[in-house]
Amino acid sequence: MSQENPLPLAAGLTAKTQQLCLGLEDGSADIYDLVTPTTAELLRWWFLEDICQTRRFNFHPGQRQAILNSIVAHEVLAAPTLQALYRQAAPDALLEGTTLREVASAKHAHPKYCLKMATGTGKTWVLQALLIWQLLNANAARAAVAVDPRFTRNFLIVAPGLIVYDRLLDAFCGKLQAGVRDFSTSDVARYAELFLPEGLRETVFGFVRGNVCAKDEIGLKATGNGLLAITNWHLLAEADEAVDEAGIEAPGAPLEPQQVIAGLLPLSPGRATGNSLEVLDRRYARGGVLDYLAGLTDLVVFNDEAHHIHEVKKEGETTEVEWQKSLSRIAEGKGRRFVQVDFSATPYNDVGAGKNKRKVFFPHIIVDFDLQAAMRAGLVKSLVLDRRKEIGALPLASTAERDEDGNPTLSEGQRVMLRAGFAKLKKLETDFATVDAEKHPKMLVVCEDTTVSPLVARFFADEFGLSDEEVMAVDSGKKAELGEKDWAPIRERLFDVDRHEKPRVIVSVLMLREGFDVNNICV
């Protein structure tokens, strides 16, 4: 891959897909004759102009291109490996540098796609659309008593952490209320008019309700006709294996006593050695999950936020270690019936250090909907610096100070910035009320640590008379204080905070990262 075109596969496949999809909106595109009747029905439902005009929601151009590129790569071109896909969509790229050697490696010896989409542009809807496409085609093949290796009813969705994991469960199973998930609040049910023709909805609803397995149910829960497993990547990664083991082997040399003990008792119990009962239980469970997934005849893995699990640093280099080992084990023996679909806004590894540091993009990127394109489409926010003459000349210290008794207190600069932000919030609340009364802007204050966040909350109460309901503190201290049971409702409220009038202000200590919907924050 050249520096001029670091994403040759995405460029080549997009050009081919756009050619095949000319006339997609009126039903005359060539692609309709190149796919199964099931896929053609879905494409018409998703993209025919007459149908799109009848509903409130539709896929935006970035989502549309991601879905179409995936279908062309997997169903139309039917490439069994990444190398085969390059030969059909970007053959010239194989002549550049080490591309051929890279894509011919064992870890790419199956269908493997990376969808590069900016954060906040609806990757989950693309994931759900592709899952539905796979499921319904697998159903059609089974009904015809046929085997089509391109399609499966077994799915594994991997999240980068617990917040996104919970969001994925919400998307498929519905919101958790009083310990029970309400399927009617799931994305699949709420946006059924987008995803599915009416005659196919109950089929998909039944599959989701009957086959979803949370991370502690994988391999244990009985599912009737497939699998929809959702987990965070830590359950599957070989995270306990040391990444950097420097040493010299000396056969025949006397062994140290601790080495003899380690040979006889490889696990030394105790938290200090990393072998608490909780850790040992997780290792045992992980082994069972990997064995179960490896035993499946076919599987599609949807990997959300893929950049998180490819990054393992060793001597200044970032390489694929932890996650790739597990994937290779699961994929073994499946051939083209193992499919990997990665979603990431930043699908690259940082290689080198200092002046030699550079980005090496994943070779399996098949679509590129980057941040600039998303901003031009109005799908993500752009930052605006609000210059104010009245505070421009003031020295604004952005960190807390201490009073005469050594207790932390807000600096005058912090107070000025909070006042300015709250003034902006009140203006936005007035403006929003005239445009969409059901959307409520919020003010987000990010503090340096948990000693400062209570000071900020108190400032809003004292300065502006805001109640506890109007100011929500979101940090590890608050979570520890409340406990998981009382914290869960707060976390759920954050997921759709812009639908509620209160809270007006959210005070955080860098907890709002992956999974927090940026559409909700306006100040």
Labelled PLM ranges:
Residues 1-523:
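RecA-like P-loop NTPase motor core of helicase/translocase proteins
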